[in-house]
């Protein structure tokens, strides 16, 4: 299992990623040849050079632009079409689209519009395309199966952007961090350390943020940024082989699922799955066990009747929990049941953005749980406990309270044409 880790003490930007990849062994000629497949080769030049930052040598990617580049501002549909028709390696093309979709959603939230309507200056700019696509080409060339990223420095101060002077971190970067709950910190350097392009690359491609995963180090590439800072303005790209089987399994799952991810407020998350079956457990203990596991933080617990050896009827119990709770839940299963072993593996589940919308019905207030993706509502259901409480208070059938609550919610929602206006 080949892992990569972005170590970002001085932040992250697209050109730093490119430089680190070339420093780690990706041939510059390969990147230049692949990028030439994009119908924009007359808008830029790409070259790499060795520089020294605070006494540390690193590789700097430079993308000087031609005159035509200054007049080109692409929208998301144009970028998607450009990438999907360029005959790039499939993974690199798919990852590139994912990065731009992530950034489009962040910009849309900032400007109160839709991702397709975002007028990109930074994102549609030629150098951003070179940085993003080049980074994805490099990761694909190195056959990276899982990418991880360190916590990111927030920076500070002000920066001039297409919409005027902005505080650092810029609004789009903040939205990207929100989408992945990225751990951030202050290193007391008040400059723009994380660019929108760098944040989008990390948030769209990294399986996790935080400490470096356990790996046998193969190579470390150093990519330099533009500014001179109190510390070396360098991104370190660590390449290695995973050394823990459980970690490797988890990383592989994250990589596979991220290849089909939708990067909006919906997300995909790794869950630990524990399973055990018994044929001699007192049924009274099962209810108590459910309570113990849920109180410990398990996301779900369920049982299924199964046929076991010697034709005995038994029960298969499955526990879903966050990976960091695996040991806790496993300990409860081993202590409280009659099992002699517990199976465990990692799975990935897609999770819709979820929020509650209260509605006033003729019976009282009911919260509607709404699930959405890409700003489109996919599911809506009344909260059971609210409906049960109102049913008990009013004497009305529970199913009627549920039906009225959902109908009331649908009536108050705007139509598609009203939302577009």
From Swiss-Prot:
| InterPro entries to which the protein is assigned, alphabetical | Ni_insertion
Claim: rRNA-binding is one of the keywords in the record: no
Q: Does the keyword Calcium apply?
A: no
List keywords of the entry alphabetically.
Nickel
Which molecular-function annotation in GO is an example for this chain?
nickel cation binding
Q: Which family does it belong to?
A: Belongs to the LarC family.
Q: Kindly provide the name given to this protein in its UniProt entry.
A: Putative nickel insertion protein
Species? Gloeobacter violaceus (strain ATCC 29082 / PCC 7421)
High-level lineage? Bacteria, Bacillati, Cyanobacteriota, Cyanophyceae, Gloeobacterales
């Amino acid at each position: 299992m080949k892992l990569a880790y972005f170590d970002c003490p001085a932040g992250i930007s697209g050109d730093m990623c490119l430089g680190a990849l070339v420093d780690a062994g990706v041939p510059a000629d390969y990147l230049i040849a692949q990028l030439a497949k994009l119908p924009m080769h007359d808008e830029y030049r790409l070259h790499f050079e060795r520089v020294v930052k605070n006494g540390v040598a690193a590789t700097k990617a430079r993308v000087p632009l031609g005159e035509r580049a200054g007049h080109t501002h692409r929208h998301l549909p144009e970028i998607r079409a450009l990438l999907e028709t360029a005959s790039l390696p499939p993974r690199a093309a798919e990852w590139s689209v994912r990065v731009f979709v992530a950034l489009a959603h962040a910009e849309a939230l900032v400007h109160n519009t839709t991702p397709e309507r975002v007028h990109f200056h930074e994102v549609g700019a030629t150098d951003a395309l070179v940085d993003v696509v080049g980074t994805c080409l490099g990761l694909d060339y190195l056959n990276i199966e899982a990418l991880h990223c360190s916590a990111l420095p927030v920076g500070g101060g002000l920066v001039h952007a297409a919409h005027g002077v902005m505080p650092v971190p810029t609004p789009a970067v903040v939205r990207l961090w929100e989408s992945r709950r990225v751990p951030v910190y202050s290193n007391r350097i008040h400059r723009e350390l994380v660019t929108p392009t760098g944040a989008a690359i990390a948030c769209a491609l990294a399986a996790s943020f935080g400490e470096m995963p356990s790996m046998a180090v193969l190579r470390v590439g150093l990519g330099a940024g533009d500014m001179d800072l109190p510390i070396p303005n360098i991104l370190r790209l660590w390449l290695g082989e995973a050394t823990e089987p459980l970690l490797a399994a988890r990383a592989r799952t994250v990589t596979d699922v991220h290849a089909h991810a939708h990067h909006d407020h919906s997300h995909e998350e790794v869950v630990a799955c524990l399973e055990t079956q018994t044929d001699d457990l007192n049924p009274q203990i099962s209810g108590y066990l459910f309570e113990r596991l849920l109180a410990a933080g398990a996301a779900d617990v369920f049982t299924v009747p199964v046929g076991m050896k010697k034709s005995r009827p038994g029960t298969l119990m499955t526990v879903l929990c966050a990976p960091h709770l695996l040991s806790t839940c496993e300990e409860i299963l081993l202590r409280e049941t009659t099992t002699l072993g517990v199976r465990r593996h990692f799975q990935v589940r897609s999770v819709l953005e979820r929020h509650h919308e209260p509605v006033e019905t003729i019976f009282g207030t009911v919260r509607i749980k709404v699930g959405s993706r890409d700003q489109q509502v996919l599911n809506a259901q009344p909260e059971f406990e609210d409906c049960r409480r109102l049913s008990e208070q009013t004497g009305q059938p529970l199913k009627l309270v549920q039906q009225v609550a959902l109908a009331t919610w649908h009536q108050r929602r705007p139509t598609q044409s009203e939302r577009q206006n």
